Curated annotation (Swiss-Prot):
Pathway annotation: Cofactor biosynthesis; coenzyme A biosynthesis; CoA from (R)-pantothenate: step 1/5
Superkingdom of this protein's organism: Bacteria
Protein name: Pantothenate kinase
The encoding gene: coaA
Catalytic activity line of the entry: (R)-pantothenate + ATP = (R)-4'-phosphopantothenate + ADP + H(+)
Keyword Ubl conjugation assigned: no
Pfam family for this entry, one: PRK
Binding, ATP: G91, S92, V93, A94, V95, G96, K97, S98
Family of the protein in this entry: Belongs to the prokaryotic pantothenate kinase family.
Compartments reported by the entry: Cytoplasm
Length: 306
């Protein structure tokens, strides 16, 4: 165990799954297939073993937050204002953050009666490609400087204060922000914020993004496994782009498999791996819980902050 994990309790999958009474998952296999990322693997057994206990833990944190808000209201002699419960989900590119976030969205909406759950990805806070090109940082896309952190912090502040907020929409097909398209985010009961940068500290800012989160999750895996998943995803994206000239990945469909693999490997090595080791993984210990995935995508270990 490294010093980084000294203030985490390591829990095996077997131990974790026994922390929650066995119940039927509140979704079907078809629903699960529809929300998982196309290069990810997850089963209803994973939902039962990992995500139902996790949902129960989130329920404990939510109740604790509400109790504290009520007590502070009494102390300050004013009525406490209802706030959304904000969950941050971070981890590397291709590690399975989106699957975790979409699954939590369904589980929370069905576990808490009449609960509303919003899901936001920080991709929408990337600067448009034109802006990145103008600043000569298109090759740094995904790195801290490629995000509009001022807008992201404004969003978190507004949502935390119960105000709705409009954010830009990002397309993985065009690899860019979609012009004139917005996502209206409601100050729901739960707001899940997913992205590689959600635990990072903005440069020259006194506000930390983690200050806004009531619960935080880091999806982890060995670097070599993440690389394999990334390369697998890249090749599958090409298959989807074959008949769509507007798709960013269409340009690679005329290349040989060897050329494609070489290009994808270079992107991983020079961009995604550097970003992971320098900026994403160092924020791992800011999470409340770390879900570690084995090479078969199954979560085999859980680290819960003490």
């Amino acid at each position: 165990m490294t010093n980084e994990f000294l203030h985490f309790e390591k829990i095996s999958r077997h131990t974790w799954q026994n922390l929650h009474r066995k119940t039927t998952p509140p979704l079907t296999q078809a629903e699960l297939n529809s929300i998982k990322s196309f290069n990810d693997k997850i089963s209803l057994q994973d939902v039962t073993d990992i995500y139902l206990p996790l949902t129960n833990l989130i329920q404990i944190y939510k109740r604790s937050k509400e109790d504290l808000a009520f007590s502070k209201g009494i102390f300050l002699q004013k009525e406490s204002r209802k706030q959304p419960f904000i969950i941050g989900v971070s981890g590397s590119v291709a590690v399975g953050k989106s699957t975790t976030s979409r699954l939590l969205q369904i589980l929370l909406s069905r576990t808490f009666s009449n609960a509303t759950v919003e899901l936001v990805t920080t991709d929408g806070f990337l600067f448009p490609n034109k802006t990145l090109e103008d600043h000569d940082i298109l090759n740094r896309k995904g790195f801290p400087e490629s995000y509009n952190m001022e807008l992201l912090l404004s969003f978190l502040d507004s949502i935390k204060n119960g105000q709705d907020f409009q954010i830009p929409v990002y397309s993985h097909e065009t690899y860019d922000i979609v012009p004139q398209e917005i996502q209206e985010v409601k100050a729901a009961d739960f707001v899940i914020v997913e992205g590689i940068n959600v635990f990072q500290n903005p440069q020259n800012e006194r506000l930390y993004m983690t200050d806004f989160f009531d619960f935080s999750i880091y999806v982890d895996a060995e670097v070599e496994n993440i690389e394999n998943w990334y390369l697998d995803r890249f090749k599958k994206m090409l298959t989807l782009a074959e008949n769509d000239p507007k798709n960013y990945y269409h340009r690679f469909t005329t290349q040989s498999e060897e050329e494609v693999v070489t290009f994808a490997h270079n992107v991983w090595k020079n961009i995604n791996l550097v970003n992971l080791l320098d900026y994403i993984e160092p924020t791992r210990n800011r999470a409340e819980i770390i879900l570690h995935k084995a090479g078969n995508h199954e979560i085999d270990e859980i680290y819960l902050k003490k």
